[in-house]
Amino acid sequence: MRESLKNSKRLVIKVGTSTLMYGNGHINLRTIEKLAMVLSDLRNEGKEVILVSSGAIGVGCHKLQLPVRPTSIPEQQAVASVGQSELMHIYSKFFGEYGQVVGQVLLTRDVTDFPISRENVMNTLESLLERGIIPIVNENDTVAVEELEHVTKYGDNDLLSAIVAKLVQADLLIMLSDIDGFYGSNPSTDPDAVMFSEINQITPEIEALAGGKGSKFGTGGMLTKLSAASYCMNANQKMILTNGKNPTIIFDIMQGEQVGTLFASKKEEFSHDGTH
């Protein structure tokens, strides 16, 4: 299964705020520059790449020198407005150093749920990829809301990245996180924690390990990643969860090395290869 990843042509890379920012609230320029280099080199190699990036509110807080993240929705959305433009400025600068053009795509749930606008998004992404441009996708935090009558939020960019992967029929979603993969117990408290190399089915037992009832693991962050993995597997797609602190790990994944946790349903092998 890992060997087949070498043939992946269309990739979606998801990067979270924890990878883009230091714990002290400052921007991790070293990681962002490495990420730009890796994705630009994949483009040079002939791969098609889409980046799903969080960080608008985090970068906005840094830009506005806010000591803590605002709690009210209007304030959060104002900070996201500043942060998103700053984030794109940083990406454009670093990708530009490697001769790569990027394009911003901001989405809300109602856009990808509604057939006509969803098709429009698909066409836009295809057009960007055809021109050799790397789309940088984020939720439109400035306008997205989550109300009973009108839900436009995805909830998190983990799910958004899985939705984007399905929209563009990506060969692989690589989710860069602050953990090496999916573990059977919390690696920060259990030195004997074992990481899963591959998961073929999201069972209730797997969900419980991710922070379900009675588990001390995580605060739900891993559950959202499992939801994204489940979404991918239901769409017959593959996802890898791995640590994003050094983005060159993406090269290792593309060489078929045992990096992170691969989520892939067994039926996926039959549907693509015709053999097991």
From Swiss-Prot:
Lipid metabolism as a keyword of this entry, yes or no, is no
TM spans (from-to): none
**Which reaction does this chain catalyze?**
L-glutamate + ATP = L-glutamyl 5-phosphate + ADP
Pathway listed: Amino-acid biosynthesis; L-proline biosynthesis; L-glutamate 5-semialdehyde from L-glutamate: step 1/2
State its Enzyme Commission number(s). Answer: 2.7.2.11
Q: Which residues bind ATP?
A: K14, S177, D178, T219, G220, G221, M222, L223, T224, K225
Q: Which SUPFAM superfamilies match?
A: Carbamate kinase-like (SSF53633)
- Name the positions where substrate binds: S54, D141, N157
Name of this chain's protein: Glutamate 5-kinase
Q: Which organism is this protein's natural source?
A: Listeria innocua serovar 6a (strain ATCC BAA-680 / CLIP 11262)
